[in-house]
Amino acid sequence: MAGLGRLDPGPRTVMPAWKREILERRRAKLAALSGGPGSGAAPDGPNERLVLAESLGPLSQNPFMRLESERRRGARPAQQLLELYCRVPGVRTIRADNILIIESAPGFPPAVPPASSIRAAEVVVYEEPQPGRVSRLLEKFDSPAAPRRRGSPERFRPALPQLPVAPASAATRAPTNRSLAPAPPVLPSQPAPPISPVPVAQRAGQRSACCEPAHPDGTAGPGARRSDFLQKTGSNSFTVHPRGLPGSAVNRSLSNGPMTQESPAGPANGLSGSPPVPGKWKPKVESKEPSLHPPPSPGTPSATPVGPPAFLAPSPASATPSQRQWVSSATSANDSFEIRPSSKPDMETIPIGDLQARALANLRVNSRNSFVLIPKRKAPGNYPSAAGRQFEEPKGEVGWASQSQGLGSQLVSTVDGAPALEKSSLAAEMQWAVREGGCPRPAISDTDKSVRRQRPASPPPFLPATTEAEPAEGLGVPGLTKNGQEPVRPGLPVTFIDEVDSEEAAFQEAKLPSSAVGVPSQYHLHPSTPGHTSELLNRGSNTFTVVPKRKPGTLQEPHLSQTNGQFQQGAEEQDADSLSGPHTTLENALKKRYPTVNEIEVIGGYLALQKSCLIKAGSSRKKMKISFNDKSLHTTFEYPSESSLAQEEAEEEEEEEEEEEGEDGEEEEVGPDSEKSFTVLLPRATFVSSVGPESSSGLSSYTPKHSMAFSKWQEQTLVQAPTEVELPPKEVMLTPASQNDLSDFRSEPALYF
């Protein structure tokens, strides 16, 4: 036993302490991983195991993983919230990178309780989306060729027998298959028609409507009858008109029948009552264009609903369809909405904590072009005249129109949301502006009454100038009453459109008295628009020059004349210029515009600059400039040597009286039109535009090379007169000595202080 006791500590004494500690740590790690306690672990074994357990831990408790999961979880509802609010009528959404501003449209009516029964004027049938990734990609990118080829009304003939012979079980099974639509099943009391009743599947939480059975005469030829009842409305949806499309006078009289005013969304697709006669206006499908309602991409802040196309944001140029279809002076009255100058908001009434409201109000305060778009409604019985005028109502108000007026008494033109018409409609509005001779009025392209989005910082397309004499009539008088139009009815949602000018003149206009006549002074044309440019800066037959440096007199006179409502006189002068260069004006209008300091407000308590200290053009700047030649910066200036400077200091004591007399004489010689330089002592180096023989650049001044020829400048630096007339040290200052020198400094690349 004694020998065994001696053999046991033998290896222990041979093994070093550091090696024994490593082994103990290894045993502790193995015990922690296997779950059992280590038999030969040292006293620090359990501590080591606890440290490992705390450092690793489960991944669900990792703080980094937890933050990442919370970020993903928070980003998902933001996208869903954006898409949801974009489809809600009466709500305007403005989305930036990480900001979503949601505000209710003013004057939008309250929600209507669901109706017990609805007599449908049209039925919207949605096809089941194809399963798989390919269909989702097709829906995301919305390729228009495949859906039109598959489900367009003209090529939908093979599927005709499926509609009349559809079993009743399919109609009752449809609500259960479509979980997105809480549609009640078809009423069993209704008789079975040739076309089985199909529930209207409405997504995004909107209530689905149970409609009455339709009774088209399905016994006729399928090709002849299908085009009268079907209309393609999207990649996977089409519209069934039970009473038929308005192809004849009988259908038109039938479609003007009464309709229950309790429909919350009105008929789908924005067609209230009966669409106009196909001779006047044809849907998008018949003109072989992309589908009427393309489903928006999930990542884009589109206001177009994915589900029922009852509330759609019109395309940028579709605010006035009559002007898009018939470009003539007969349709220039713009009977769908009215533009009025908007008043500036009161910043004192906005609470300080509401940063978003203050930012929007500041944008409107600093904008030169602020509009209020007020939709107009015709009285019952006023149909479009023979000239082709149509009345368009915003999509967000179709449901309300069905409550306040009979839907059969209105004609609402369907506005397509496809961006393919932007170029053609923009050219049409340009042509309209040329024919009218008026100044195209800029406005933000999206003139939807229920959704407001911010456009990128580029000059927007032109909105027709329909309110030529509005500012003179004041805010209370509608600008279109002179054309015989009815006044605006109360309760309609209006849209405010603000356009911030890119120059300093925005603040000059904001300083003008705006309460004199009751008209805001910022209501005038954008100075960079083609109409304004051709009026002020037309240099040739078809050349329009944009010069940012402009005197305040020439800048404010046309603005005042336009504010007083004198648009027609400028329109007559610009008619020939607009006719000669429409392409140039369009090119100038679509140039990229960068935001200026006037458009940027630092939210967070730093500073909101009213003007830039580095702005290039402006009437209130100081005349001090620093000019450099960009090509020869390294050899532009030459400073005197130390020896010549010491020699100059010795001569200063002898010639103090001559210096004062020479300074007076030099000030008399330099006039407003003479090109002379002035000299200051170092280190206050002066900036000379040109050098005359009287005052050469000597020891205490330098001469820029670009102001004269290089040979003369070289000779002048070699032959420097030591007895140079100089300023006394007490007159060293930042500004020039004489005020007459202010007009001598002109150079293009300059900094203004």
Curated annotation (Swiss-Prot):
<dbReference type="GO" id="GO:0005654">
    <property type="term" value="C:nucleoplasm"/>
</dbReference>
<keyword id="KW-0539">Nucleus</keyword>
<feature type="region of interest" description="Disordered">
    <location>
        <begin position="544"/>
        <end position="583"/>
    </location>
</feature>
<feature type="compositionally biased region" description="Low complexity">
    <location>
        <begin position="300"/>
        <end position="322"/>
    </location>
</feature>
<dbReference type="InterPro" id="IPR026671">
    <property type="entry name" value="PPP1R18/Tprn"/>
</dbReference>
<feature type="region of interest" description="Disordered">
    <location>
        <begin position="637"/>
        <end position="676"/>
    </location>
</feature>
<dbReference type="GO" id="GO:0003779">
    <property type="term" value="F:actin binding"/>
</dbReference>
<dbReference type="GO" id="GO:0032420">
    <property type="term" value="C:stereocilium"/>
</dbReference>
<comment type="function">
    <text>Essential for hearing. Required for maintenance of stereocilia on both inner and outer hair cells. Necessary for the integrity of the stereociliary rootlet. May act as an actin cytoskeleton regulator involved in the regulation of actin dynamics at the pointed end in hair cells. Forms rings at the base of stereocilia and binds actin filaments in the stereocilia which may stabilize the stereocilia. Acts as a strong inhibitor of PPP1CA phosphatase activity. Recruited to sites of DNA damage and may play a role in DNA damage repair.</text>
</comment>
<keyword id="KW-0009">Actin-binding</keyword>
<dbReference type="GO" id="GO:0005902">
    <property type="term" value="C:microvillus"/>
</dbReference>
<comment type="similarity">
    <text>Belongs to the taperin family.</text>
</comment>
<feature type="compositionally biased region" description="Pro residues">
    <location>
        <begin position="182"/>
        <end position="197"/>
    </location>
</feature>
<feature type="compositionally biased region" description="Polar residues">
    <location>
        <begin position="230"/>
        <end position="239"/>
    </location>
</feature>
<feature type="modified residue" description="Phosphoserine">
    <location>
        <position position="502"/>
    </location>
</feature>
<feature type="region of interest" description="Disordered">
    <location>
        <begin position="141"/>
        <end position="348"/>
    </location>
</feature>
<keyword id="KW-0966">Cell projection</keyword>
<feature type="compositionally biased region" description="Basic and acidic residues">
    <location>
        <begin position="337"/>
        <end position="347"/>
    </location>
</feature>
<dbReference type="GO" id="GO:0008157">
    <property type="term" value="F:protein phosphatase 1 binding"/>
</dbReference>
<feature type="compositionally biased region" description="Acidic residues">
    <location>
        <begin position="648"/>
        <end position="672"/>
    </location>
</feature>
<dbReference type="Pfam" id="PF13914">
    <property type="entry name" value="Phostensin"/>
</dbReference>
<keyword id="KW-0650">Protein phosphatase inhibitor</keyword>
<dbReference type="InterPro" id="IPR025907">
    <property type="entry name" value="Phostensin/Taperin_PP1-bd_dom"/>
</dbReference>
<feature type="modified residue" description="Phosphoserine">
    <location>
        <position position="402"/>
    </location>
</feature>
<dbReference type="GO" id="GO:0007605">
    <property type="term" value="P:sensory perception of sound"/>
</dbReference>
<comment type="subunit">
    <text>Interacts with GRXCR2; the interaction restricts TPRN to the stereocilum basal region. Interacts with actin ACTB; the interaction may stabilize stereocilia. Interacts with CLIC5. Interacts with PTPRQ. TPRN, CLIC5 and PTPQR form concentric rings at the base of stereocilia and may form a complex. Interacts with phosphatase PPP1CA; the interaction results in inhibition of PPC1A phosphatase activity. Interacts with DNA damage response proteins XRCC6/KU70, XRCC5/KU80, PARP1, TOP1 and TOP2A; these interactions recruit TPRN to sites of DNA damage where it may play a role in DNA repair.</text>
</comment>
<dbReference type="GO" id="GO:0120045">
    <property type="term" value="P:stereocilium maintenance"/>
</dbReference>
<dbReference type="InterPro" id="IPR025903">
    <property type="entry name" value="Phostensin/Taperin_N_dom"/>
</dbReference>
<feature type="compositionally biased region" description="Polar residues">
    <location>
        <begin position="323"/>
        <end position="335"/>
    </location>
</feature>
<feature type="modified residue" description="Phosphoserine">
    <location>
        <position position="274"/>
    </location>
</feature>
<dbReference type="GO" id="GO:0019903">
    <property type="term" value="F:protein phosphatase binding"/>
</dbReference>
<dbReference type="GO" id="GO:0120044">
    <property type="term" value="C:stereocilium base"/>
</dbReference>
<keyword id="KW-0963">Cytoplasm</keyword>
<feature type="compositionally biased region" description="Polar residues">
    <location>
        <begin position="250"/>
        <end position="263"/>
    </location>
</feature>
<feature type="compositionally biased region" description="Polar residues">
    <location>
        <begin position="559"/>
        <end position="571"/>
    </location>
</feature>
<keyword id="KW-1009">Hearing</keyword>
<feature type="region of interest" description="Disordered">
    <location>
        <begin position="438"/>
        <end position="488"/>
    </location>
</feature>
<dbReference type="GO" id="GO:0004865">
    <property type="term" value="F:protein serine/threonine phosphatase inhibitor activity"/>
</dbReference>
<feature type="modified residue" description="Phosphoserine">
    <location>
        <position position="458"/>
    </location>
</feature>
<dbReference type="GO" id="GO:0060088">
    <property type="term" value="P:auditory receptor cell stereocilium organization"/>
</dbReference>
<keyword id="KW-0597">Phosphoprotein</keyword>
<protein>
    <recommendedName>
        <fullName>Taperin</fullName>
    </recommendedName>
</protein>
